[in-house]
Amino acid sequence: MVISAEKQTVILKMAADFNFYGKRLRATKLEVCDDISKMVYDTTKHSTAICDWLEANKPAKPKAAKVAKAIKNDERPEAAGIVSSTVEQWEVKQGKRFIITSIQNNTFPHKNFLASLEQYAQFIGADLLVSKFIYNKNGFQNGEGADGIRYDSAFDKYICNKNVFLNNRRFAFMAEINVLPTADYPLSGFAETATALNLEGLAIGAAKITAESVPALKGEIVRRMYSTGTATLKNYIQQKAGQKAEALHNFGALIVEFDEDGEFFVRQLETMDESGVFYDLNTCATPAGCYETTGHVLGLQYGDIHAEKLDEECAAASWGHGDTYGLVDILKPKYQFVHDVHDFTSRNHHNRASGVFLAKQYAAGRDKVLDDLIDTGRVLESMERDFSQTIIVESNHDLALSRWLDDRNANIKDDPANAELYHRLNAAIYGAIAEKDDTFNVLDYALRKVAGCEFNAIFLTTDQSFKIAGIECGVHGHNGINGSRGNPKQFKKLGKLNTGHTHTASIYGGVYTAGVTGSLDMGYNVGASSWTQTHIITYANGQRTLIDFKNGKFFA
């Protein structure tokens, strides 16, 4: 079939209109040619010939005109490399106090929070340092490559572009690190970095507030890692990663202060709303200024107590000793939260089958459960304050007493030092059962009725909720999801919690975990350890911070 030149032009135009060359299948192309044949020849019998002709005469695509590239002066070196680590070149910024945070490119500041940070930095004589991170650099006007990256000018005088040490070479602000705000765990991989660089502490700028403790060999310092939170608004790509991250965005910063020995103390600063207001200990920072305040601390959760193995120095700094004041007297919290108050050392299920352990307890005069109870009760008595209600969160070590009393293999006839107490407490348990008293707590009973201690604490039961400022404080952390072992990372799915159990201070999402008030060496923690003596402060606005005990104090 011969197609005239006039009809060829018409057929090519119609093929373009019907996207003939965009069809992959021959059958689909023939359907298009049926329509073309009908319109050009008033019959479909020429569709095959038209299809063959179109395939043989596909128009060539016009070549795009080449745009001449602008010639740039490339000042990059041809090669580089050093033998020593760059850490040796990091500047040491002098000063006693620093406030550090981060900002995102092409993003407005949280103006009130920035104003509060500036006010607080001036109030305490701190340097304000800001690191930068890049995200979604092509999502803004003129955003092709580095030329489109902008940071709000309000931060210009605070920008820190290089990794620096603060005060001394033990704590580093790694301001060069670019951590995407969508990262689930901003500190992932930096534990090895801290160890390799011999850093005792490090902080990186990130949109999330997190904290981790790096395990150390026995007798060595547990390294601490922090991410700052950010002083810029939420600005995320509304896809899966962005929407996940947006929900966990923290308007936050860290205060890092140093004592005369160069020891660092870090606390989290976070504003919970558009006001920009935040607390640090007894100071309230606002965009208009800072002032001392009271009645703003809802909760002080101590690191796990373990009364029989208590660190007396940490305890004295926490709730005082004799005529001395402790942290509780400074903060005056509405509630004190106590985890693992009782260690149950003398007959703990981990050791009571060991003849060597029992012999050591006997030789030390510590083989009586009653003595453990008295120690525990005395600790609770020393915590008593008129302004604060003590809450005992039921914990695995607290439950060790009832586990012993219900253990058919306890062989109490071979334990005369504890036989009378064993039977007395069991009698109380069975009496409560007979009375259908579901609220009976054998540890509470033993401390008050047997050990003769007087205190006004409330004992929670396992799974009993106790919330302050929307934060669950009734979970110790030993029971995980669906019968598994508890783990702070696992608890992220449960919302905002303050937990204990691990003796390892951390922040993962809405889960803050305290350390320990007891000794850092309890005998059974053999090998490397990430334990720290760390409490949790919860403010009335829902803001929280970890607070560490070092050098006999909680702050510089």
Curated annotation (Swiss-Prot):
GO terms for biological process: degradation of host chromosome by virus; symbiont-mediated suppression of host gene expression. Keywords: Bacterial host gene expression shutoff by virus, Degradation of host chromosome by virus, Early protein, Host gene expression shutoff by virus, Host-virus interaction. It comes from the Viruses. The keyword Translocase does not apply. Signal peptide: none annotated. Induction: Expressed pre-early in the viral replicative cycle. Expressed with a few other proteins from the first step transfer (FST) DNA. FST DNA corresponds to the first small portion of the genome that enters into the host cell at the beginning of infection before pausing. Coiled coil: none annotated. Involved in the degradation of host DNA and the shutoff of host genes and phage pre-early genes. Together with A2 protein, involved in the second step transfer (SST) of viral DNA into the host cell, which leads to the complete entry of viral DNA into the host cell. This gene is part of the long terminal repeats present at both ends of the viral genome and is thus duplicated. Homooligomer. Interacts with A2 protein; the two proteins form heterooligomers. Part of a complex containing the host RNA polymerase, protein A1 as well as another viral protein of 11 kDa; these interactions are probably involved in the transcription shutoff of pre-early genes. This is Protein A1. The lineage of its organism: Viruses, Duplodnaviria, Heunggongvirae, Uroviricota, Caudoviricetes. The gene is A1.
